[in-house]
């Protein structure tokens, strides 16, 4: 549409440059490291009658969309698992051209070889272009970034030019610098095509270049709350012109304790703005934030309304003890690294554990690198770049990287430490199986995590995953008060030490319990050669086991005494079956790893560049 197009360089001849007062460009920035961030910001008292008017409804329904019947719309929404709440929600667009984006935006879309809008884009674009407030709840990797960036470009093109001293028109708040940088990378390509300017404001990087961008004028500012409040307090930018506000991963920002900063920032923005809130979950804290910041909003949910994981992810849970994790991790990595696609993220709970595990794996020759919040921005950026380009295919991370980390070809996620909530679990495993791809998530679950066992089982059942019988046993133990102390995991502790080893099943009692839980015909959670979300034996019924697993191929393989299939959930070990098990798999279709009689020579150490201590 011609009304959307704009070939004007909005930053041309505005005369923005360095201040001519001498001294530091940064000026007297707040040096307080502790205290109350934003305490210098005064809540503005807005008088809408005195504010300049602005337009925010630019949506014109495409003729093809107008001819689509309500029944066709409902059929499409059901097929894409789109749930809509709110009044007067526009119809979803089924093709890019139906959104009526400017020609230069469509050119970028064509270069990126997108075939059709994702579900959240199809329903989100008409809502955002209509100027309505909205909440979008969708799983990771669903295309949320373009869902708000492309309508933002249309919104900006219909606003007056920025003048000297004006702040951004579009503000995107993100929880982490990694996510902010990724949004900036996406925005930069479209902004170049539309002759707009964008910048990324985050902590851990020099303030000078960021201030320089703001002084020159930017239409789009992607920022983390802390650094933005710092700049607002010292007067390096303002939000007087902001009419399009995006809260990306709002649930994560609340988890990280940013709610006070978010509220102080929103107080600086005119109340008749358009606000879009995006989240992967919909807890009561996010609902309250939406009620406070949004007006008559449209709620769009993609997928199940309850807490759910991506169904393209094969989830494997190993119930074990903390002392067994290292051995299990190494055996798992030996199989994963023999795969052609082996990019893996290992999540741990603490920064100390991240550093210790990284040092240990690198000492043993594994190409691993670590990332957590105490790393400098330069080092974090370098580590992520090495991981993205496959130079270090093993990334050991805390939850700082669990949200918004968008690496397309991550095939495996390992939860070395189980997170504190099922929401974090879903976000962690969501680093694999981006878009329509498949992936595998392994989780070490210990008795210390028993408070999360019910939620984890619910997530597994919703995604039609096989459930480890030991998880069900933990639920029973918890109900009978035997989950901790003398009664908890009684058999596991006795079996672990009675055989003198700490790995797998080492006693006849363990095998007996194992047979009872799965039936004597099945010694594994999944059928023959299950690979990355392809459920070759899907005959589990309502989470029950034993005779309900009726795959004839599996039964035959075990009756013949030559078992094949998958090495899943820690219920099998080389010591148990010995040479009778030719194939040991971890949810992958590959040749068995041949465990040598003596320790193999370590791999060549992966060199760390100078300047980064381990």
Curated annotation (Swiss-Prot):
User: For this protein, what is the EC number?
Assistant: 3.6.4.13
Q: Where is this region: Transactivation domain?
A: 477-614
Enumerate the spans annotated as Helicase ATP-binding domain.
125-300
Q: Which residues form the Helicase C-terminal domain?
A: 328-475
- Name the GO terms of the biological process aspect: alternative mRNA splicing, via spliceosome; androgen receptor signaling pathway; epithelial to mesenchymal transition; estrogen receptor signaling pathway; intrinsic apoptotic signaling pathway by p53 class mediator; miRNA transcription; myoblast differentiation; negative regulation of transcription by RNA polymerase II
**What UniProt keywords apply to this chain's record, in alphabetical order?**
Acetylation, ATP-binding, Biological rhythms, Cytoplasm, Helicase, Hydrolase, Isopeptide bond, Methylation, mRNA processing, mRNA splicing, Nucleotide-binding, Nucleus, Phosphoprotein, RNA-binding, Spliceosome, Transcription, Transcription regulation, Ubl conjugation
DEAD box: where is this motif? 248-251
Could you tell me what this protein does?
A: Involved in the alternative regulation of pre-mRNA splicing; its RNA helicase activity is necessary for increasing tau exon 10 inclusion and occurs in a RBM4-dependent manner. Binds to the tau pre-mRNA in the stem-loop region downstream of exon 10. The rate of ATP hydrolysis is highly stimulated by single-stranded RNA. Involved in transcriptional regulation; the function is independent of the RNA helicase activity. Transcriptional coactivator for androgen receptor AR but probably not ESR1.
Q: What is this protein called?
A: Probable ATP-dependent RNA helicase DDX5
This chain's source organism reads Macaca fascicularis (Crab-eating macaque)
UniProt lineage:
Eukaryota, Metazoa, Chordata, Craniata, Vertebrata
């Amino acid at each position: 549409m011609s009304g959307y197009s704009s070939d004007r360089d909005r930053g041309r001849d505005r005369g923005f440059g360095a201040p001519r007062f001498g001294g530091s460009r940064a000026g007297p920035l707040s040096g307080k490291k502790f205290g109350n961030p934003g305490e210098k910001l005064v809540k503005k008292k807005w008088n809408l009658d005195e504010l300049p008017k602005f337009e925010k409804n630019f949506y014109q329904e495409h003729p093809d969309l107008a001819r689509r019947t309500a029944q066709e719309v409902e059929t499409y929404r059901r097929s894409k698992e789109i749930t809509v709440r709110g009044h007067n929600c526009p119809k979803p667009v089924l093709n890019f051209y139906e959104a009526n984006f400017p020609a230069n935006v469509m050119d970028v879309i064509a270069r990126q070889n997108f075939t059709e809008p994702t579900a959240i884009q199809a329903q989100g674009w008409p809502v955002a272009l209509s100027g309505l407030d909205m909440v979008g709840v969708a799983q990771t990797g669903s295309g949320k970034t373009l869902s708000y960036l492309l309508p933002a470009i249309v919104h900006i093109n219909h606003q007056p030019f920025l003048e000297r001293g004006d702040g951004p028109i579009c503000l995107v708040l993100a929880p982490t610098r990694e996510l902010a940088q990724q949004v900036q990378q996406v925005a930069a390509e479209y902004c170049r095509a539309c002759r707009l300017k964008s910048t990324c404001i985050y902590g851990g990087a020099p303030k000078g270049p960021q201030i320089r961008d703001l002084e020159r004028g930017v239409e789009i500012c992607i920022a983390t709350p802390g650094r933005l409040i710092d700049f607002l307090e010292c007067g390096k930018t303002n939000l007087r012109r902001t009419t399009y506000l995006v809260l990306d991963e709002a649930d994560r920002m609340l988890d990280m304790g940013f709610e006070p900063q978010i509220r102080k920032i929103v107080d600086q923005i005119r109340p008749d703005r358009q606000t879009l809130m995006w989240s992967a979950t919909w807890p009561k804290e996010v609902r309250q934030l939406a009620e406070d910041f949004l007006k008559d909003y449209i709620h769009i949910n993609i997928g199940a309304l309850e807490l759910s994981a991506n169904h393209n992810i094969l989830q494997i849970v190993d119930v074990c003890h903390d002392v067994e994790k290292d051995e299990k991790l190494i055996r798992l990595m030996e199989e994963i690294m023999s795969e052609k696609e082996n990019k893996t993220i290992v999540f741990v709970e603490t920064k100390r554990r991240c550093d210790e595990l990284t040092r240990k794996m690198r000492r043993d020759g594994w190409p691993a690198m670590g990332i957590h919040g105490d790393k400098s921005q330069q080092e974090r950026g370098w580590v992520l770049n090495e991981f993205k380009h496959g130079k270090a295919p093993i990334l050991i991370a805390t939850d700082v990287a669990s949200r918004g980390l968008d690496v397309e070809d991550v095939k495996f996620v390992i939860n070395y430490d189980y997170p504190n909530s099922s929401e974090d679990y879903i976000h962690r495993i969501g680093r694999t199986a981006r878009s329509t791809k498949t992936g595998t998530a392994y989780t070490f679950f210990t008795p210390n995590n028993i408070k999360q066992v019910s939620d984890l089982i619910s997530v597994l059942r919703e995604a039609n995953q096989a459930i480890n019988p030991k998880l069900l046993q933990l639920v029973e133990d918890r109900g009978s008060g035997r989950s901790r102390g003398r009664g908890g995991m009684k058999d596991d502790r006795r079996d672990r030490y009675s055989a003198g080893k700490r790995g797998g099943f080492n006693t006849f009692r363990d095998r007996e319990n194992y047979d009872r839980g799965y039936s004597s015909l099945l010694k594994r959670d999944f059928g023959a050669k299950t690979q990355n979300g392809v459920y070759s034996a899907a005959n589990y019924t309502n989470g029950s086991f034993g005779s309900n697993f009726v795959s004839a191929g599996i039964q035959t393989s075990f009756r013949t005494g030559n078992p094949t299939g998958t090495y899943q959930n820690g219920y099998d070990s080389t010591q148990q079956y010995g040479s009778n098990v030719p194939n040991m798999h971890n949810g992958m279709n590959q040749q068995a790893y041949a465990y040598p009689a003596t320790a193999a020579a370590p791999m060549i150490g992966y060199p760390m560049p100078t300047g980064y201590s381990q």
